[in-house]
């Protein structure tokens, strides 16, 4: 479309496939006030996060199209594909112009967003074709959103929150399935007998789950502050459970999986599995430490039954980060790694210095399960991987 391709490629999903033409929507986790990506007349605000839409030909192994499909949003981290073929792009940054007089807290002290013109911290819906009409889905909450996964049978959307020390795991029950802007109920998970889910978990130990209502989903800040924990604090006050730094979220075969990047005994991350029918929750993987695979982030379920896990490493190890797999039996294995010998330049970046330390993100499969698409977050590019896959769980 003539616009520069943004950097910081993060969450991504396949929203359509017709024959060999696969359409993907890709997030860009940018957070600078200035000129929005794409057409400024179609942007939500004056920050530079958003999405691009890619069309890839699997028969030819070639990229056919690349265009901006959402602009003017803040720190678009992950999201999720809806059952009706759109992409939900989630803002991980929370901001309100009405609170500009209060001092920023935490990471926001270092972000260049003080001149942002709009409210941020919401979910936006992006169509497979054209450019999104940038309307926040306020009923889904104003918080540090990460990922979304749908139970297509019920229409319920499940969401993770990437905040610390207080993060929630949420579900949104839409008033009208398929029409999220019609509103609905936002609820936060309560693990019975476990108000703190950040540590002390055992592999395979099942926990009963309940849900508490969030009275005011649009209250993104703790009262009188710019601390972006207003929604989580409402849930905690009603008895919900506290998680930390929740990341990826995936739904398949009636169950849901989600990750915590820094939870667990080693504060290096874990993966949970949830049964919404039985209302049970249990841990299926826990990182053994920051010298091992750590910081589990974006996830997707392979059509062959294995969970694909992107690494956002928590240590200073300079070897390339990995994409891993988890079998239904709980066996963990590494699938691929950023090549530490990677060289050359891309968009002004020395890849040997930039890409090697980058996280993986955006894992998603083509509808036929033959192609796996992944992003290398920095400097921001997408790879397409094909099989043969038949001999393994991925």
Specify the residue positions occupied by each region the protein language model found:
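Sequence/structural signature of beta-propeller domains
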Residues: 1-394
